[in-house]
């Protein structure tokens, strides 16, 4: 396998209407780092939480396809709301260096009850770059559900890309989960969070043994990673530090299934709604 270079753009974003800024920053990044193969942006980077027509996927995707082709880079320009069949989903497009849409990755778990009215997905998003390896994508709150990353790893993903939009006080918990995910799935974990008025930054890149490779602050920065995914396969074969081989164990004994879910207990937890004041 050959080496592959990725940049994560943690940008100082306005609440919405960031398209021109995003394009400018992509252009600047390619000039400064001409050896890059892929650029990734944060969740909803262009339009933020707005669901206005101008920020929807269909009204933005062609421009980013043209940009990816022009700059000869793979591009995940964050995510966009996508209106289809009377539903709205949160979708991260994967665009090849030829300008082709390789995948539309839909967020499995919208951030309910805050991301109200957004439909979920039960499909995993995985794609292959020939000669490089297998990539998985899940979006923001999907990180909180280890089943999503396990599903990606069990389909062969050697790196998980994670566009995120977090501006809340639980960012430290998310960074802990990013490390745990990399360890449990024995893969690279590439998290890009929003900055500026959208998010609190602190993007993190983790290696397949849980080692923190890059951790950004809260200001505008670029996270860089150069990978050879043969390392992931070696660790999965031999174990982390020559010890645990969790993917093999799960392969041989996949204990998690719907028959073992206590539905009565889960129902007793109540509706998925905004918390009320404690009495």
What positions do the PLM features span?
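Cys-nucleophile CN-hydrolase/nitrilase-fold catalytic domain and related Cys-dependent amidase chemistry
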Residues: 16-101, 168-183
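Conserved hydrophobic/aromatic beta-strand scaffold that supports enzyme active sites
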Residues: 8, 91-94, 104, 124-126, ...
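C-terminal beta-strand edge segments of enzyme domains
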Residues: 126, 194-279
């Amino acid at each position: 396998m050959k080496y592959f270079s990725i940049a994560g753009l943690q940008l100082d974003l306005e609440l919405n209407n960031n398209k021109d800024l995003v394009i400018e920053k992509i252009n600047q990044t390619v000039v400064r780092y001409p050896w890059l193969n892929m650029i990734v942006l944060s969740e909803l980077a262009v339009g933020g939480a707005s669901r206005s027509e101008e920020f929807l996927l269909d009204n933005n995707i062609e421009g980013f396809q043209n940009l990816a082709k022009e700059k000869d880079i793979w591009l995940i320009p964050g995510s966009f709301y996508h209106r289809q069949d009377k539903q709205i989903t949160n979708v991260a497009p994967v665009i090849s260096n030829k300008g082709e849409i390789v995948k539309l990755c839909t967020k499995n778990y919208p951030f309910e009850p805050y991301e109200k009215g957004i439909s979920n997905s039960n499909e995993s998003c995985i794609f292959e770059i020939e000669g490089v390896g297998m990539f998985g994508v899940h979006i923001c709150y999907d990180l909180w559900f280890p089943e999503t990353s396990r599903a990606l790893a069990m389909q062969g993903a050697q790196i998980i890309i994670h566009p995120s939009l977090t501006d809340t006080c639980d960012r430290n918990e998310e960074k802990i989960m990013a490390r745990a995910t990399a360890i449990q799935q024995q893969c690279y974990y590439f998290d890009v969070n929003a900055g500026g008025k959208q998010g609190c930054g602190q993007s993190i890149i983790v290696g397949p043994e849980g080692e923190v490779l890059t951790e950004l602050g809260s200001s505008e920065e670029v996270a860089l990673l150069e990978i050879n995914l043969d390392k992931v396969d070696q660790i999965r074969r031999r174990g982390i530090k020559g010890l645990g081989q969790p993917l093999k164990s799960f392969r041989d004994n996949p204990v998690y299934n719907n028959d073992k879910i206590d539905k009565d207990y889960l129902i007793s937890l109540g509706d998925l709604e905004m918390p009320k004041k404690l009495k």
